[in-house]
């Protein structure tokens, strides 16, 4: 399980000074450009955690993860002040917007944010700015969390749950570093217009500045340096101008990391290689849209999207930690959700958000222990194991956290 958290990049911070935040749909928050590390405060053992349960199974998995986080922290002498706030569809139903100002303020002033899931069929017909998913867009943009870290590891206990053959899936352990706040999702111009022939035209712009590429590349090089020393940069430099610049900047930085082996791969080939030979990858760095697609593809190698956590980090302000799965409204409220991705997101929160590596390792070890004992939610169940629900899986992890000796890292 150590592979889930096998990175030691210093992107975490001192608390930011509150900035400007103009409206719920056109946020203009600006924070000072400085490194944030909550753990940098000497002797600090009390942290403010913003909990954003969201929609669907979000409240269920957050409730379980909160208990595990609190227990692991208490065993390492940590105290948490939790502030639970509405977001996404839940906020729309409550106050009419996906990200209330009070929610954003609580998130901005916290030491770290743990989010459940956002979205659902109920709000699919809303106007774009009133869709639940826009809350996540605003949070990422305005907290300036530009680096998204998504581990994809096939645990020995779950190798048979992978969609790939055992000999292909066994031993897979990679980290995808995705640029999160630039590219085609944010580029201008964008929108749907009418051309001179009266025909509708949709425009989205893929655009990256050199500094945006450099900062995500540095995160990726540092990540690879702490893992197996291999970095693959994925682009489409044979066609896209933005990718030509991407490759140029990443290549230029490689001289600063002589201990990291850098390779380049076109995104279409990368998508194929993830299925053909996923073990060849250690650390992948790529842009926003390619990372969005490839990380979801990689998640299925592990056997279930319900197993994978993520961390979104910036140069200032709190980090955002969340499972990569969606809100799964079809199983919401039925105690069927797999809480392990959220529990492991809490472990990433401890390590990357707070610098509390021992507490993080307690959670990692507890997840492995629960799996070793045969406990499985429906998405990872196989005959011979014990089928449990969301709550019981959380309880088993909690028992394992309590029974473990002090963690060493």
Curated annotation (Swiss-Prot):
<dbReference type="GO" id="GO:0051287">
    <property type="term" value="F:NAD binding"/>
</dbReference>
<feature type="site" description="Confers substrate specificity">
    <location>
        <position position="137"/>
    </location>
</feature>
<feature type="site" description="Important for catalysis">
    <location>
        <position position="185"/>
    </location>
</feature>
<keyword id="KW-0432">Leucine biosynthesis</keyword>
<feature type="modified residue" description="Phosphoserine">
    <location>
        <position position="74"/>
    </location>
</feature>
<keyword id="KW-0100">Branched-chain amino acid biosynthesis</keyword>
<dbReference type="InterPro" id="IPR004429">
    <property type="entry name" value="Isopropylmalate_DH"/>
</dbReference>
<keyword id="KW-0597">Phosphoprotein</keyword>
<feature type="site" description="Important for catalysis">
    <location>
        <position position="236"/>
    </location>
</feature>
<dbReference type="GO" id="GO:0009753">
    <property type="term" value="P:response to jasmonic acid"/>
</dbReference>
<feature type="binding site">
    <location>
        <position position="140"/>
    </location>
    <ligand>
        <name>substrate</name>
    </ligand>
</feature>
<keyword id="KW-0520">NAD</keyword>
<dbReference type="GO" id="GO:0009555">
    <property type="term" value="P:pollen development"/>
</dbReference>
<dbReference type="GO" id="GO:0009570">
    <property type="term" value="C:chloroplast stroma"/>
</dbReference>
<feature type="binding site">
    <location>
        <position position="238"/>
    </location>
    <ligand>
        <name>NAD(+)</name>
    </ligand>
</feature>
<protein>
    <recommendedName>
        <fullName>3-isopropylmalate dehydrogenase 1, chloroplastic</fullName>
        <ecNumber>1.1.1.85</ecNumber>
    </recommendedName>
</protein>
<dbReference type="InterPro" id="IPR019818">
    <property type="entry name" value="IsoCit/isopropylmalate_DH_CS"/>
</dbReference>
<feature type="binding site">
    <location>
        <position position="268"/>
    </location>
    <ligand>
        <name>Mg(2+)</name>
    </ligand>
</feature>
<keyword id="KW-0560">Oxidoreductase</keyword>
<dbReference type="GO" id="GO:0009611">
    <property type="term" value="P:response to wounding"/>
</dbReference>
<feature type="binding site">
    <location>
        <position position="296"/>
    </location>
    <ligand>
        <name>Mg(2+)</name>
    </ligand>
</feature>
<keyword id="KW-0460">Magnesium</keyword>
<comment type="pathway">
    <text>Amino-acid biosynthesis; L-leucine biosynthesis; L-leucine from 3-methyl-2-oxobutanoate: step 3/4.</text>
</comment>
<keyword id="KW-0479">Metal-binding</keyword>
<feature type="binding site">
    <location>
        <position position="269"/>
    </location>
    <ligand>
        <name>NAD(+)</name>
    </ligand>
</feature>
<dbReference type="GO" id="GO:0019761">
    <property type="term" value="P:glucosinolate biosynthetic process"/>
</dbReference>
<dbReference type="GO" id="GO:0005829">
    <property type="term" value="C:cytosol"/>
</dbReference>
<dbReference type="GO" id="GO:0009507">
    <property type="term" value="C:chloroplast"/>
</dbReference>
<dbReference type="GO" id="GO:0009536">
    <property type="term" value="C:plastid"/>
</dbReference>
<dbReference type="GO" id="GO:0009098">
    <property type="term" value="P:L-leucine biosynthetic process"/>
</dbReference>
<dbReference type="GO" id="GO:0003862">
    <property type="term" value="F:3-isopropylmalate dehydrogenase activity"/>
</dbReference>
<keyword id="KW-0464">Manganese</keyword>
<feature type="binding site">
    <location>
        <position position="292"/>
    </location>
    <ligand>
        <name>Mg(2+)</name>
    </ligand>
</feature>
<dbReference type="Pfam" id="PF00180">
    <property type="entry name" value="Iso_dh"/>
</dbReference>
<feature type="site" description="Essential for redox regulation">
    <location>
        <position position="232"/>
    </location>
</feature>
<dbReference type="GO" id="GO:0000287">
    <property type="term" value="F:magnesium ion binding"/>
</dbReference>
<keyword id="KW-0934">Plastid</keyword>
<keyword id="KW-0150">Chloroplast</keyword>
<feature type="site" description="Essential for redox regulation">
    <location>
        <position position="390"/>
    </location>
</feature>
<comment type="subunit">
    <text>Homodimer.</text>
</comment>
<feature type="binding site">
    <location>
        <begin position="322"/>
        <end position="338"/>
    </location>
    <ligand>
        <name>NAD(+)</name>
    </ligand>
</feature>
<comment type="function">
    <text>Involved in both glucosinolate and leucine biosynthesis; catalyzes the oxidative decarboxylation step in both leucine biosynthesis (primary metabolism) and methionine chain elongation of glucosinolates (specialized metabolism). Catalyzes the oxidation of 3-carboxy-2-hydroxy-4-methylpentanoate (3-isopropylmalate, 3-IPM) to 3-carboxy-4-methyl-2-oxopentanoate. The product decarboxylates to 4-methyl-2 oxopentanoate. Required during pollen development and involved in embryo sac development. More active on 3-isopropylmalate and NAD(+) than towards D-malate.</text>
</comment>
């Amino acid at each position: 399980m150590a592979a889930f958290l096998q990175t030691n990049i210093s992107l975490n911070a001192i608390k930011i000074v509150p900035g400007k935040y103009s409206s719920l749909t056109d946020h203009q928050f600006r924070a000072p450009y400085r490194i944030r590390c909550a753990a940098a405060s000497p002797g600090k053992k009390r942290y403010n955690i913003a909990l954003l349960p969201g929609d669907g199974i979000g409240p269920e998995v957050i409730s379980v993860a909160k208990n595990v986080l609190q227990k692991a922290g208490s065993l390492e002498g940590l105290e948490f002040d939790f502030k639970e706030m509405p977001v996404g569809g839940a906020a729309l139903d409550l106050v009419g917007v996906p990200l209330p100002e009070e929610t954003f303020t609580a998130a901005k002033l916290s030491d770290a944010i743990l989010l459940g899931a956002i979205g659902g069929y109920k709000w699919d017909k809303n106007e774009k700015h009133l869709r639940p998913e826009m809350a996540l867009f605003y949070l990422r943009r305005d907290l300036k969390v530009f680096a998204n870290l998504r581990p994809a590891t096939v645990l020995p206990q779950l190798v048979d749950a992978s969609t790939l053959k055992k000999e292909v899936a066994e031993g897979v352990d990679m980290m995808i570093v995705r640029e999160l706040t630039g590219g085609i999702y944010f580029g201008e111009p964008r929108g749907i217009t009418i051309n001179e022939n009266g025909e509708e035209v949709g425009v989205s712009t893929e655009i990256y500045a050199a500094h945006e590429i450099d900062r995500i590349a540095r995160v990726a090089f540092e990540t690879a340096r702490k893992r197996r020393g291999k970095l693959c940069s994925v682009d489409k430099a044979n066609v896209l101008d933005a990718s030509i610049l991407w490759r140029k900047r990443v290549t230029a930085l490689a001289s600063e990391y002589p201990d990291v082996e850098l390779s380049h791969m076109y995104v279409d080939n990368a998508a194929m290689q993830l299925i053909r030979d996923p073990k060849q990858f250690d650390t992948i760095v790529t842009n926003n849209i390619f990372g969005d697609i490839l990380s979801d593809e990689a998640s299925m190698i592990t056997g279930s999207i319900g197993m994978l956590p993520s961390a979104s980090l910036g140069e200032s302000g709190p980090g955002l930690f969340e499972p990569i799965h969606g809100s799964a409204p079809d199983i919401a409220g039925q105690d069927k959700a797999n809480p392990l991705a959220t529990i492991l997101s809490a472990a990433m929160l401890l390590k990357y958000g707070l610098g509390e590596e021992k507490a993080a390792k307690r959670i990692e070890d507890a997840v492995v222990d629960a799996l070793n004992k045969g406990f499985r939610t429906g998405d990872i169940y196989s005959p011979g194991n014990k089928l449990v629900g969301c709550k019981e899986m959380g309880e088993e992890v909690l028992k394992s956290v309590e029974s473990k000796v002090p963690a060493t890292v």
